[in-house]
């Protein structure tokens, strides 16, 4: 069991105990209804506070996790570019390690990190890179659809 502590000003100190339970491996169809997609999109875009009020992790990990929260929904950034963004241009491997130790993979969207060559890279949650690829495809499709919908309303 792992204990995670974080502070939310409006609430106070929260402690979350997690057990090592297996992830569900059931396939979820990519074609989910738009209203359900929008609901998940809303949650994923507003779930990550900035700065992340975590009381765990090193200062470097927290810097990486905060930067991850600023990657827009449906977009990606390379490990190298994120390292440059946080002022640690040679620390791209350390960025990958910080992402791998992310305590809340969907809330802090480490799946939006990719390799400089455009390949997926690793992912510590669920089925690993396979899940990461599905999340990225879903986000990109939904972001594109939302963009098209907003253009058609203008």
Residue ranges and their predicted role:
Residues 1-89, 142-154:
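Basic nucleic-acid-binding alpha-helical/helix-turn surface characteristic of O6-alkylguanine DNA
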Residues 10-13, 104, 119:
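Short acidic/polar mixed-charge low-complexity motifs
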Residues 90-105:
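Regulatory, non-catalytic segments
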Residues 105-113:
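Extracellular LysM carbohydrate-binding repeats and other cell-envelope/extracellular binding modules
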Residues 68, 82, 110-111, 135:
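Residue-level signal for inorganic ion chemistry
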Residues 116-154:
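…primarily DNA-binding HTH/wHTH and HhH modules…
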Residues 63-67, 94, 134:
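Pre-recognition alpha-helix immediately N-terminal to the DNA-recognition helix
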